[in-house]
Amino acid sequence: MVVQNERKEKICCFYVSEFHLEMILVPYINEKINENITILTEKKLRETLEILISKMNLKEDNKEKILKLGWDGEEKIKENSNIIIVGSKEFIKNKNEELENKNVLSVLDCYDFEKEKDGIDNIVKKYKNSLNTLGKNNFWNF
């Protein structure tokens, strides 16, 4: 039986460093802390995240929940989850293909700006919304 894709939202994000990525992601995750969140990443982000979280003004419970997410690799994909994918363009493409037949609430694809800057126009055409340090924005409302 094929599961109908119930994905409600597809968002992209561009970052210039791991700290920058985490400064974008932590408020987004904090807002969705009571929902399922799955992180699929090629990078080991836990060390920099711990430094950042220790300096942020968040509820202690939320800090703990955020730190328990899979920041050092791939988590098992949970149904009805908000998926965050961090990695190369190829990694992101492969993970999105894996998600095609899964029921997920949203997918946030996070690209390294320096590695993707020459092809950024082609990337953003695939998305309606972006996430940055100001929050979620619609690309086409500028």
PLM features: what roles do these ranges have?
Residues M1-F142:
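Non-catalytic regulatory/interaction regions at protein termini and inter-domain linkers
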